[in-house]
């Protein structure tokens, strides 16, 4: 097994959101919030904002709403 595999996998993450666009947008927006000082909503050893955001999505600690203008 390749040790560089991302956990959770993209396949698993896509089961929790509508599509890849939503996944990327959610991850980017949440990572930006974390960089700006928001507290992590999950327990994780990593300090990397993208890793934390992905874990939050995987654990369904954050939600999203699709609006006409995009993702909120």
UniProtKB/Swiss-Prot annotation:
Which Gene Ontology molecular-function terms are recorded? DNA binding; DNA-directed RNA polymerase activity
User: Pfam families under this entry?
Assistant: RNA_pol_Rpb6
Q: What is its EC number?
A: 2.7.7.6
Q: Where is it found, in Gene Ontology cellular component terms?
A: DNA-directed RNA polymerase complex
Q: Which InterPro entries match?
A: DNA-dir_RNA_pol_omega, Pol_omega/Rpo6/RPB6, RPB6/omega-like_sf
- SMART domains named in the record: RNA_pol_Rpb6
Reactions mediated catalytically: RNA(n) + a ribonucleoside 5'-triphosphate = RNA(n+1) + diphosphate
Ordered alphabetically, the record's keywords are: DNA-directed RNA polymerase, Nucleotidyltransferase, Transcription, Transferase
Q: Which biological process terms from the Gene Ontology are attached to this UniProt entry? A: DNA-templated transcription
Query: What does the record give as the function of this protein?
Result: Promotes RNA polymerase assembly. Latches the N- and C-terminal regions of the beta' subunit thereby facilitating its interaction with the beta and alpha subunits.
NCBIfam families registered for this protein in UniProt: rpoZ
Q: Which family does it belong to?
A: Belongs to the RNA polymerase subunit omega family.
Q: How does it assemble?
A: The RNAP catalytic core consists of 2 alpha, 1 beta, 1 beta' and 1 omega subunit. When a sigma factor is associated with the core the holoenzyme is formed, which can initiate transcription.
The identity of this protein, by name, is DNA-directed RNA polymerase subunit omega
